[in-house]
Amino acid sequence: MSIKKFNPNTVVKPFNNAYHHCVVIPPNAATLFISGQLGLNLDGTLPQDPQLEADKAWENVIECVQEAGMGTEDIVKITAYLTDEGDYPYFANSRSKFLGDARPASTAILVKALVKKEWRFEIEAVAAKSV
């Protein structure tokens, strides 16, 4: 059995068609849990441009997925934390750029702050792949 993604006809369609409401992971799948990824460069510096910060956060998620031998199509759940509603377009643009046609179950949450006040985005992910 492969991973199944779907949207019930009895539930409102996903916002911007950017995700699926439901994902079923088969019992024989390897599951990867990715801690919240920030938009920090390898040297720990933070891009000052919000689009670059969002891109880097997504790039870090993808690096984790690929290191586990998986691809964007294997991402089954995203939870994103944003500190400013006005930054959502940056997040959405990067999401589209890095996920392409992948449509994992998703939640975006507006929070007062992350651990450091200058951080704008944090993205957690779960990926699964049949073995």
Show the residue positions of the predicted features:
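N-terminal presequence-like segments and the immediate start of the first folded domain
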Residues: 1-59, 63-76, 82-131
